[in-house]
Amino acid sequence: MTRSLKKNPFVANHLLKKIEKLNTKAEKEIIVTWSRASTIIPTMIGHTIAIHNGKEHLPIYITDSMVGHKLGEFAPTLNFRGHAKSDNRSRR
């Protein structure tokens, strides 16, 4: 279910302040965050945000096609390594 249009998109306050500070200085640096639920807004375009996936921070460069999505969508948390090899010895 999507968020109501009457409400604004959720962005963590600490993340929004960091983005606005970098935009006023016109600097580019990696922003580290644990806020996977924050929505990507147009002021974030061009910044690199390191999003936590539960183990480490993955740096993600924000482009205009990502606007409206959540940060957590671009940092996968599960690491599927494939099913076990079909081995007759393991069946016994």
Swiss-Prot record:
- Give the gene name: rps19
Q: Mind telling me which PANTHER family this protein's record contains?
A: RIBOSOMAL PROTEIN S19P FAMILY MEMBER, SMALL RIBOSOMAL SUBUNIT PROTEIN US19M
Q: Report the superkingdom from the record.
A: Eukaryota
Organism from which the protein derives? Nicotiana tomentosiformis
Task: Report any one BP term from Gene Ontology.
Answer: ribosomal small subunit assembly
Signal peptide positions on this chain: none
Describe its function. Answer: Protein S19 forms a complex with S13 that binds strongly to the 16S ribosomal RNA.
- May I have one GO cellular component term? mitochondrial small ribosomal subunit
SUPFAM superfamilies named among the record's database cross-references: Ribosomal protein S19
Task: State the similarity comment.
Answer: Belongs to the universal ribosomal protein uS19 family.
Gene Ontology MF terms in the entry? rRNA binding; structural constituent of ribosome
Instruction: Tell me the InterPro entries matching this sequence.
Output: Ribosomal_uS19 (IPR002222), Ribosomal_uS19_bac-type (IPR005732), Ribosomal_uS19_CS (IPR020934), Ribosomal_uS19_SF (IPR023575)
Chief site of localization = plastid
Protein name, entry field: Small ribosomal subunit protein uS19c
Where is the protein localized?
Plastid, Chloroplast
Keywords carried by this UniProt record: Chloroplast, Plastid, Ribonucleoprotein, Ribosomal protein, RNA-binding, rRNA-binding
